[in-house]
Structure formats: C-alpha cells, structure tokens
C-alpha cells in the first residue's frame, strides 16, 4: 500500500489534486461514483417513503464502495482517515466532475 503524505492541507483547493492522485485507478473512481449515486438514491427513497431507517445505510454504502476501491484496487489507505472533511467534500466534487465528464468515468 502507498504511504500518505505528511503534508497538512489548509485549503480544499490545495487538497483536491492530492485527492485525485489517490484515485488514479479508473475502477476505484467508478466504485466511488456508484457509492455516491446509491447514497443519493437511498436519501431520495428515505425522504419520499419517510422510512428513516434507510438513512443508516448511507454511510455503509458510500464508504463501503469507496473503501473496497482503495484497499482492493488502488492498494492505498483512504484519505478519509487523515482528512475526513476534505475527503468527504472531495468525494462529492469528484462525483460532480465525473457527471460533467471533467474526469473520465
């Protein structure tokens, strides 16, 4: 597994290139995309059906897909462990960038 940098990021704009470098494997990015998409679907279902217990599945699905991508495909440690907030934001920015085809899906 690759080692994380000891660098601390004070701005998300500085963190995001590091985040993308940790997601160089296309299959890993696709797993992130699927996890994020399923999180949105679960959220929509919970809101429409008012079955709030489904909200508990959101972190399991979102992080589950992402972590499989990191440990199995990227062979690195998810940035979430060192940068939880920036990593969470990075997931959604990367999702948007894949939707808009700025990053290949």
Labelled PLM ranges:
Residues 46-54:
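Transmembrane helix interruption/hinge and helix-loop junction motifs
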Residues 31-45:
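Core segments of transmembrane alpha-helices
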Residues 61-74:
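Transmembrane alpha-helical segments that form the membrane-embedded catalytic/substrate-channel core
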Residues 43-46, 69, 98:
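Structural signal for membrane-spanning alpha-helices in multi-pass inner-membrane proteins
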Residues 55-60:
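Hydrophobic alpha-helical transmembrane segments
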Residues 21-32:
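Short, amphipathic, aromatic/basic-enriched membrane-interface segments that mark the entry/exit
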Residues 2-19, 75-105:
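Membrane-proximal soluble regions of multi-pass membrane proteins
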